[in-house]
């Protein structure tokens, strides 16, 4: 099929006397699709949680048939009504901030019973959540962002999905999910996969354990699961023309499959960039996950960019201290940054003060000292 010309055809599925016909189209590839420009160290990313940003279309606030049919801006765990149209309407405002890229928390369907606003329990990897808009509206947002000189980074989650995902509710095979679809909690010990003293069991629980009871853990060692996830990301790059991917919970997924994924994407799109969420408190342990890391050798993650969570911690401490000795305040940052020598590519670190999982920096004691 890789050699097939663009065309429309039908896929016919049969089971006994039952038959289902699915119309399908192999689309024409966009010119220069493989030359998509990724984000890099010269870019400033503006993080947006779509449900919390701007409501540009009130008609999609509540979609009949979806499990969470409530909008309540007084409830921090409910949906607030933000959508893709709201973001598109504010692109001039965003561009005028001086940022060069937008990082969107997940926009794919998250049809869960509660807490669906954050998007991290995907129920359909190929569809935008209808409360945000449509696939076409997402593509329009990317095109409009590009017209204003803004890149777009898409959040993806390969470690787990939501338990309302059709792939979990009707598994193609029992080994699509770890522990045969039975809930076993991860330990969240992200240092364990690189720990030379960790037992095989300890490593298995981190990687195969579920993030939560409603987030079943994909078995990426299943070649069909791996192919499904890899192809879905390539489809979004081709379809929408995004400039980057931020991969959630990167250390919780299977190392080899994620390495194959990073390699497959960057071989197809040489200038594309992927950043992994590597939430670990040590720069040495974070460096393990970066492409060509000597710490991980002979294994290679092929992940170009990692998130510098240790630097976030250091900055929150440094700005809450007096710079009056050799260790405190800005001296802390001076010494810490010199340790970036542990990274294979120190110029490919995503630096940030906070994100959607942490308190806002400007509300912390470090930013607002009490006199």
Protein language model regions, located:
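Conserved, mostly hydrophobic/aromatic
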Residues: 48, 94, 104, 125, ...
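Aromatic- and acidic-residue-enriched segments that line the glycan-binding/catalytic groove
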Residues: 112-124, 158-203, 263, 284-304
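Core domains of carbohydrate- and sulfate-ester-processing enzymes
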Residues: 36, 44, 91, 166-215, ...
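N-terminal structural segment of carbohydrate-active enzymes
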Residues: 1, 6-150
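Short, solvent-exposed turn/loop segments enriched in Gly/Ser/Thr/Pro and often Arg
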Residues: 50-52, 60, 100-115, 156-165, ...
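Active-site-proximal helices and loops of the catalytic beta/alpha 8
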Residues: 142, 146, 160, 165-168, ...
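Hydrophobic faces of well-ordered beta-strands that scaffold small-molecule active sites
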Residues: 44-46, 102-104, 152-154, 245, ...
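The substrate-binding groove and active-site-proximal loops of carbohydrate-active enzymes
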Residues: 70-85, 121-135, 163, 211-226, ...
């Amino acid at each position: 099929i890789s050699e097939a010309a663009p065309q429309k055809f039908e896929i016919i599925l049969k089971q006994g006397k039952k038959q289902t016909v699915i119309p399908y189209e192999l689309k024409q590839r966009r010119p220069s699709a493989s030359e998509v420009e990724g984000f890099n160290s010269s870019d400033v990313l503006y993080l947006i949680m779509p449900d919390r940003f701007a409501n540009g279309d009130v008609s999609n606030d509540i979609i009949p048939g979806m499990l969470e049919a409530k909008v309540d801006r007084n409830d921090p765990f409910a949906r607030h009504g933000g959508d893709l149209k709201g973001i598109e309407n504010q692109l001039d405002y965003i561009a005028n901030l001086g940022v060069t890229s937008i990082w969107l928390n997940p926009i794919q369907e998250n049809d869960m019973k509660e807490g669906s606003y954050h998007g991290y329990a995907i129920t359909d990897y190929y569809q935008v959540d209808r409360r945000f808009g449509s696939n076409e509206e997402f593509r329009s947002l990317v095109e409009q962002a590009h017209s204003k000189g803004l890149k777009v980074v898409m959040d993806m989650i390969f470690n787990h999905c939501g338990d309302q995902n059709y792939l979990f509710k009707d598994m193609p095979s029992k080994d699509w999910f770890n522990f045969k679809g039975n809930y076993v909690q991860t330990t969240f010990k992200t240092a364990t996969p690189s720990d030379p003293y960790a037992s095989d069991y300890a490593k298995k629980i981190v990687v195969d354990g579920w993030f939560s009871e409603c987030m079943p853990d994909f078995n990426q060692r299943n070649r069909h699961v791996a192919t499904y996830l890899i192809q879905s990301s390539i489809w979004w790059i081709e379809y929408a023309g995004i400039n980057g991917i931020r991969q959630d919970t990167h250390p919780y997924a299977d190392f080899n499959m994620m390495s194959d994924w990073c390699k497959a994407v960057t071989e197809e799109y040489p200038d594309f960039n992927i950043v992994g969420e590597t939430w670990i408190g040590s720069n040495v342990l974070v460096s393990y996950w970066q492409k060509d890391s000597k710490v991980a050798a002979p294994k290679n993650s092929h992940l170009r960019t990692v998130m510098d969570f240790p630097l976030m911690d250091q900055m929150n401490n440094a700005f809450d201290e007096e710079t009056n000795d050799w260790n405190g305040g800005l001296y802390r940052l001076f010494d810490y940054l010199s340790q970036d020598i542990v990274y294979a590519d120190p110029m490919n670190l995503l630096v940030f003060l906070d994100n959607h999982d942490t308190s806002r920096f400007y509300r912390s004691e470090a930013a607002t000292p009490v006199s």
